[in-house]
Amino acid sequence: PYDDTPWQGTMRADNKDFVFFDNAYSSYVQTVPTLERALSERNQYDDKPFLDSANILDVAKKAGYTTSWFSNQGVFGEYDTAISLMAKTADTTKWSHESYAFSDRYDESLLPLLQSVDPSKNNFIVIHIMGSHIYYNDRYPHEFSKWKQGPYPDGQEAYANSQLYTDWLLQQIYTYGKEKLNLQAMVYFSDHGESLDKSH
């Protein structure tokens, strides 16, 4: 019942170039194993070893793109996870902070990093946000507190507010890309869903 994706809703209704996939599912329930499978040829059906799998940055580079990876999820340990290993293969890799903790920086901290992208090149950019990850009430600034929280700080209202903030962020990325970077395509997906009563 929450109108927490107004920009996406408008684009869905008014822009024939936008494609939305309903009933999408994740290949796993946690970030690292999901992105291993979503961003490489490894998948839940054959479970090819990650280190033997081409990833999306490998493919983009082979196609002649200059690659960038910007993340608000922390480094995790530079060589400790598949995500960090994949990110480090980009031509440019930047994190909003250099450790893994649930970020105290809002995802908009990634927006200035887009200004470092050379618009004269063919660019492939991965932007890894915190989005609506647990501790939803920590994921958005006060001005996005549209719905008053109930008795639980990580309940539906906080989750809806975090979705509203992500919707705004996507609009900023899209607008900047169209105006400054010759944006040709943009894909957004959540790496996994959330069970609000279990916080994951």
Where are these regions (language model features)?
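Active-site-proximal alpha/beta segments of enzymes that process anionic O-linked groups
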Residues: P1-K146
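Active-site rim elements
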Residues: Q44-D47, D154-Q163, Y174-T175
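A solvent-exposed, charged loop/short amphipathic helix patch at secondary-structure junctions
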Residues: Y140-A160
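Metal-dependent active-site segment of extracytoplasmic phospho-/sulfohydrolases and closely related
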Residues: P1, Y165-H200
